[in-house]
Structure formats: C-alpha cells, structure tokens
UniProtKB/Swiss-Prot annotation:
Residues 404-433 are annotated as: Disordered. Keywords: DNA damage, DNA repair. Pfam families: DNA_mis_repair (PF01119), HATPase_c_3 (PF13589), MutL_C (PF08676). This is DNA mismatch repair protein MutL. Belongs to the DNA mismatch repair MutL/HexB family. GO terms for cellular component: mismatch repair complex. It comes from the Bacteria. The gene is mutL. Gene3D superfamilies: 3.30.230.10, Histidine kinase-like ATPase, C-terminal domain, MutL, C-terminal domain, regulatory subdomain. NCBIfam families: mutl, PRK00095.1-1. This protein is involved in the repair of mismatches in DNA. It is required for dam-dependent methyl-directed DNA mismatch repair. May act as a 'molecular matchmaker', a protein that promotes the formation of a stable complex between two or more DNA-binding proteins in an ATP-dependent manner without itself being part of a final effector complex.
C-alpha cells in the first residue's frame, strides 16, 4: 500500500471539490470507507445522540504509521493515488484526501492507529479549524479507531440544521445497509446510545449472503428475488432482481459500480424497460453490482461521489437491460421465447409438407437428411444468442435456471425518465421526462428487428403452380413432360434471397442496432479500410467504429443479424483489402449468412414463382435429372 503524502497542486486541482461533512451520516460514510480501503474485515460503529455527540469507528485494517498520522489530517493528503494516471483508474472508495481534514475542522477528532510493523500505537488529536495536530503514544491493536466528538461544535448554524437524533441515526442506518449489501465479506456492527442495533455477520457463502439480504431488504424480497450473474468481456453484472410475481412494493433500489454505491438514472431506466410488460410493478426492487474496467468509468464527476460517468453509457445501459431481460425470460416471466443458438447451424430449415397440397409440422433440413420436429411458435420467435452467460434462480426457493445466452436484438434509444427518488436534476431535465413505451410499441419495434422471412409483394398472391412434393426434406420433385428431376430447396432459397437482396442494395439496406455492440480486436489498417469503403459500408446498413484498438459493431443488416458477427465482419473487412465486391457478390454473401434460421418451403416456392421466367429457368437448371427411364428398363429386363 502506498504511503500517505500531500497531493501535487496540479492533481489536487483536478479532483472535484468534496461535499464531505453534510450530516453525521456523511462522517460515518467517509470513515467506514477509509476502513474498507485499509483492508479491514471488521468495522464497529458506535453512535451517540444520532452522531452529534459521538461517532466512533473501529477497524482491524492495516493502520497508519506514526509518521503519517499528522499528515493524514492534512487536506489533499491520501494514500489512494499520487498521479493523474491513478485518477483515471480508481478502485478505492476515497481518493481526494479531504475527509479527515474536513471532519476534524468541524469537530474534536482523535485518530488512534497501529500498523503490524509497529510495537506500539500512536494517537493524533485535532480540534476545530486551526487543525493543529498533537501526536502521542497510545494502546491499540493493529488497525485504527477514529472518534468524532461534538460534531459542528464550532459552526452553530450548521448544527441547528441537524434533524432529530432519531432522523440522523436513520440516515446512518440506511447508509450502512447499502454498504452491507456490496461488502458481504465484512463484519459490520452498529451501536446507538449503547444498544446494538445492527450486527451484519460476514457472508462467506450464498446462503449467508441471503441472510444479510433478508436483514437489509426484508424476507419478501429476499425469498423470491432472482439472482443475476452475467459476464461479457470486461463487464460483469451480479446481484438480485425483484421477482415480477412478487406483490410486495420494495424500496430496495441499490446500484453499485466497482463496489461504489451510486445514483444513476441509466440503471433505473434499464430496470423499468426490462419490466415494461409488467405494468403493475412501477419500480421493481434490485440490488445490482456492476464490475467494469476502471478506465471506462469516471468517478470524479460528482462532489459527493454519488454519480459516475461511463465512457460508453449506451453500451452499459443496453448490457444491463439485456441481462435483466434474459433473467426474466429464463424465469418464465416474459413472453419471449429463445431458440437454440442458430449461429452454428449451416443448413436451411423448412416446413415439410407430406404432399404437394398438405403441409405437415415444421422440420429441420439437416446435412444428414433427418427430419426433426420443431414447435411452430419457435419459428415465429427464434432469436439469436451471444456468448454472455446469465444464470438465474429464485433466491429463496433455490430455483436455478441453466446458463444461456442473451439476445442481440435491440430496443431503440429511448429517452430516460427522471427518477424522483434520485438526486436533484435541472429543470430542463425535469421537462424532458418521457414515459416508457407501451407494450404495443415495444412489440412493434421488436418486430422490426427480426431477421426477414421470405415475403411476397402481394400478400394474397397464390403461386400459379402448386408446390411440388418434397423428397427427404431437401428436394422438390419436379416433373415436366417425360423428365423427372430433384430441385434442391437450399439452392432455390439461396437464389431467391440473392435476388431479393440485390434489388434492395440499389437504395441501401437498413441497419438494425445491436442491443449489445460486438467488440473484436482491430488490425492496424482497419481504420483505413473503413475510411476507404465508407460508402459501401453504409450502403450495407453497417455501422462500424474503432475505439481503443477495438472494432465496435453497432449496426448490421437484418440478413446477418443471427450470424457470428465477431467472425463474419472481420473476415469481410479482410476481403475488402484486396477488392471491392460487386453487388451480386455482396448479395450472395448476405444471403448465405441469412439462411441459418427457419424458413418455410411454401414461402420459398412463392418467392420462386414470382421471379422472371429467365431467372426461374437459371435456378431450375440446377435440378438433378433422375434417370427414371433407364431404371425402369433395368427393372423390366430383370
């Protein structure tokens, strides 16, 4: 651990001014966070008269060396960071070096501490604004104890603004609940006027953590809460989400970023949107913990550290939203149906009729020509999956779902409603409040993001010729005059899809936003490739950017939405280095990747029937001629 030292003026000026001492709860927050930063496994909090008379924090952390005690009470003195680079990747609670100095300036503060290397403890005492520090020997185990006596004794005006002892203690108790949930490994005790009020024992396993969750949020929330576990690259979301079937109105709304409790409308909106089809839950309860690369979040944007700024806020929002939606889906609470991952499937799926006029249950067209029944509703709701694994279970009853992927289809960029329970925002923001979209709007928008199926220009169109019989689930049996041939359905599907795409390429394809953008390592020359082929990329409906040596895939045309984008897009960019593909080649590339989902044989036949005669003939020429006459002759000769 770094030693305590005065921050350089340049670094001190870069740090947002702290609103450290607002009320007794503010003092408890700062001091307990210091204990946690010092590696304490136990923190005891003693309060007298709501904190106005006494606040005493005792921990078993690493302690403060004797020669740093006086320095610890100086302004802008901290062991948490020393350079501007440290400020860009903060994982500790404290970093400004203002807490002890601010607290000692409005109280009588005594700091007693001992490190493991010292044979005796030392005590520092400071009182009031003069901040003169006296250091003397003391008796104390390894760790620190801080006593704050007579808070605001020298600022009567601020003391008069304190509420009743009960109210001030309630604020302290509420803050302790928040820290108890994110630091389940810490033993926390809270005493008021000599009476133990809280005793949060360390939670070393899930069952013990659920006991702590019950203490903080109540049994109704803890027993039915859905457990969230989701990992994707440098993002990890964990915690508990209120069960949609729970009738209890929960006031548990806690969101942590790298262990720091923050107020953020982003996660509030994501939770509301995930529950959009559960109108009876106006504000579901949640305890969510987001772990993110500290370089991707700025915790130095709010004086009291209540807010953070994400470098990619939309990405974080969509990640949280998708994780919560997937958890609710797995719990069986939303009417979304997952299919298995379609990215690994290379064959066309069709509905197999038993005859030319009678259509049976859908089946899978596989390489082994086996017929596999598929539920009809799955065809309508098949969704792509990505690699992020989400594990869901009911915390109280122990119901656990299997790991599964999260969807990549996106709800659009919706305005974030203001949460009245969080922070003070400007009047301008207040006027911009937007209600959540209706169920119909969400369903309509979701339908726009489905991979297109075969469609005909006229919905009432009926093919002039009846669809031929299907052989082995892979071929149409074509009979013309004295010829009998097999036309591969897969070839027809590919050809008709190529015709459809090539016709749309002239005006440009419409890109669909990914709910969770895909990120892959970028080659050094990819930026040049993107710049050179910008028009072509936009024509295909792609939105690609490069940030921090990563290719970010934000939008794709619907035809490749179900593909392995992390593989397909880089391979395509590699090919652009050598040549610019013709429209027909682009259409074939998109069509090939679009045929990994479910399609209908009648729809393929209808699309084929609408083609011009010369194009139909080109496709029909791919039919495999059956030598039925010679076979009959052989049979007759026997």
């Amino acid at each position: 651990m770094m030693g305590i030292q005065i921050l350089p003026p340049q670094l001190a000026n870069q740090i947002a001014a702290g609103e450290v001492v607002e009320r007794p709860a503010s003092v408890v927050k700062e001091l307990v966070e210091n204990s946690l930063d010092a590696g304490a496994s136990r923190v005891d909090i003693e309060i007298d008269k709501g904190g106005s008379k006494l606040i005493k924090i005792r921990d078993n952390g690493s302690g403060i060396p004797k020669d740093e005690l006086a320095l610890a009470l100086s302004r802008h003195a901290t062991s948490k960071l020393h350079t501007l680079d440290d400020l860009e990747a903060i994982l500790s609670f404290g970093f400004r070096g203002e807490a002890l100095a601010s607290i000692s300036s409005v109280s009588r503060l005594t700091l007693t501490s001992r490190t493991a290397d010292q044979t005796e403890a030392w005590q520092a005492h400071a009182e009031g604004a003069d901040m003169a520090v006296k250091v003397m020997p003391a008796a104390h185990p390894v760790g620190s104890t801080i006593e704050v006596v007579d808070l605001f004794f020298n600022t009567p005006a601020r003391r008069r603004f304190l509420k009743s002892d009960k109210t001030e203690f309630t604020h302290i108790d509420e803050w302790l609940k928040r820290i108890a949930l994110v630091r389940g490994d810490i033993h926390l005790t809270l005493t008021h006027n000599g009476k133990t009020v809280r005793n949060y024992r360390p939670a070393m396993n899930e069952a013990q953590y659920l006991q702590r969750l019950t203490q903080v949020s109540g049994r109704p929330f803890a027993e039915q809460a859905l457990k969230i576990e989701c990992q994707h690259d440098d993002l990890r979301l964990s915690g508990y989400l209120q069960s949609p079937w729970s009738p209890v109105i929960s006031d548990t709304h806690y969101f942590y970023v790298n262990g720091r409790l923050i107020r953020d409308r982003l996660v509030n909106h994501a939770v509301r949107q995930a529950f959009a089809q559960k109108a009876e839950l106006e504000q579901p309860g949640y305890v969510l913990m987001l772990d993110i690369d500290p370089h991707q979040v700025d915790v130095n944007v709010h004086p009291a550290k209540h807010e953070v700024r994400f470098h990619q806020s939309r990405y974080v929002h969509d990640y949280i939203l998708q994780a919560l939606q997937s958890a609710l889906e797995e719990a069986g609470e939303l009417n979304f149906v997952h299919s298995s991952s379609l990215d690994e499937v290379e064959d066309v799926f069709v509905d197999a009729p038993t005859s030319a006029t009678e259509i049976s249950a859908p089946f899978v067209l596989g390489a082994d020509s086996a017929q596999v029944n598929v539920p009809a509703d799955t065809l309508e709701s098949a969704q792509p999956l990505v690699a992020s694994a989400v594990q869901v279970k009911s915390a109280g009853a122990g119901r656990e779902g299997a790991s599964f992927g999260t969807q990549t289809n996106a709800f659009g960029s919706m305005a974030t409603p203001r949460d009245n329970s969080r922070g003070n925002y400007s009047a301008g923001e207040s006027r911009q409040r937007t209600e959540l979209p209706s169920k119909a709007a969400i369903a309509s928008y979701g339908a726009l993001l489905q991979t297109p199926s075969y469609s005909v220009k006229d919905q009432d169109y009926q093919p002039s010729l009846p669809m031929p019989a299907i052989l082995d689930g892979q071929y149409w049996v074509m009979a013309t005059a004295d010829k009998l041939s097999l036309l591969p359905i897969k070839s027809v599907a590919l050809a008709t899809r190529c015709q459809e795409i090539e016709a749309k390429l002239a005006t440009g394809l419409i890109g669909q936003p990914l709910l969770m953008p895909v990120s892959v390592a970028a080659d050094a020359d990819w930026q040049a490739v993107l710049d050179e082929h910008d028009t072509l990329i936009r024509q295909l409906g792609l939105e690609l950017t490069i940030r921090y040596q990563q290719l970010i895939i934000k939008k794709v045309p619907p035809y490749i939405r179900e593909s392995q984008l992390a593989k397909v897009i880089p391979e395509w960019l590699q090919s652009l280095r050598f040549e610019t593909p013709a429209p027909s080649a682009l259409a074939f590339w998109l069509a090939k990747h679009s045929l990994t989902g479910f399609v209908s044989a009648p729809e393929i036949w209808a699309a084929f029937s609408q083609l011009a005669e010369e194009k139909k003939q080109l496709i029909a020429n791919k039919a495999i001629l059956l030598p039925w006459q010679s076979w009959l002759e052989e049979q007759a000769s026997e």
